[in-house]
């Protein structure tokens, strides 16, 4: 880099005498371990189709030098510009380049495009974040699982050691410098990405099961005619991985059409595709995982789509709640603190228990407003919106809203959700709650349910008061984005090829000695406490280059049904990396704990780094964060 820092990279080149375009993936995952398999699937495939493909570990991550920096931060984007300049200055380059990535790598590609470098002609962003919404709260309501589990994961990723196979004997010095520089409280990501300055053509992929689905809709809406979006049923994964919920598609073939059009000038028909291609989820019985979600592909020529209209459901008319005296104007909402225990994962990644199970128990802890059985099917595409007239007598409050599909047998499948903070003591006020965007087909005979609760643990930190709030149904309305049932008439089918990948060297996965359920709920009846335990499937991986990796992750959340300030969160992560041929054996241990009081959240992180069983670095961090 211009400051002398060296970044670890791997370059795949096509066998040709002609200049070729280049592709850049700039990501914080280590290319020798964390992303080794998926890198081997796609970068050689792109090279085999005539592209120079470069995979780079972000500064301070993997085997790169320097202090940890998010690749989409201002400093990380500076590195991205330097990498782009290096690529396009190679003698084999035709001067045109594209950038791609998933998650933080996809966000880095968007941030790079916002700098408008001349050589960057196209971007493919998967499950990316345009950073229009804060990462630590949901409409002002502080997130618990996101702040705690997500921050612990980011801290662990930043603390992974360099690999001596690529850095030589310097690995220990680089690791100790990295550990000394890590700050779990730092937020180096930067602000929202300014989409107005993006000149590259953007193809965005996302999944309805991923919290960043809204980014795809915003990119299609704001970037104009050279942007395209694809939203499938997927979790936070590449669309060709086949992880639930599927079905998977030929992501590499689809992106090759994009690269060929913008980097080679070939007529591949990509601009003839609908601006937005979406998977319309069919109604299914609730389950924590679906191998393939039933549904169909649909196409819309723009976003907002002319085929989507707003339909309003008043909470005292089209939707009604049971058990409220007819003379009462306000309906009390006072949920037990463990409401939300069946929320599912905040960011599903294809696990066996990632999705929310049957919502009937959650509905019983909430106030529900139901429609009559639908006389005909109703398909939603976009973000539902909720306007509530509420009264909150406490100092603070929060509302969690869930949209559910209720089958004739009473089973309740979660469709969308959202939340907002409430300011108390001001009398009746109007509150806007944006629910996550969805594509869902309600069948005839099913009911639409809006469930309101005053707690949603562990997604949201509980407020100190337990009084909840009151809602005025007559002043409240749910607005649904309803797509015309005949919108597909006369349109050609939306199709994708099946997945293709480059051949991948074999990894070894020895059977784990101990395993834990991926998601386990325990109710201690005598203590009145609810505990949620999340475990990543344990085990070891031996990578093709001989690196042995073993990681164990256990998250635990607990709360009492009547004690909001007793909420506790804890994550334990252990990572061991070993190269037996050179006698290299290191372990990283991280414990992160979080608690709350009426005005603050307290987070304690404890990190230990070991070499050959001996502790070579240990550090504690304690942060006290105001709830606001």
Where are these regions (language model features)?
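N-terminal cap/lid segment of alpha/beta-hydrolase-fold proteins
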Residues: 1-17, 370, 374-376
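Short beta-strand immediately N-terminal to the catalytic nucleophile in serine-hydrolase-like folds
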Residues: 99-101, 126, 205
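C-terminal, loop-rich substrate-recognition/catalytic regions characterized by aromatic stacking residues
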Residues: 230, 238-239, 244-610, 614-628
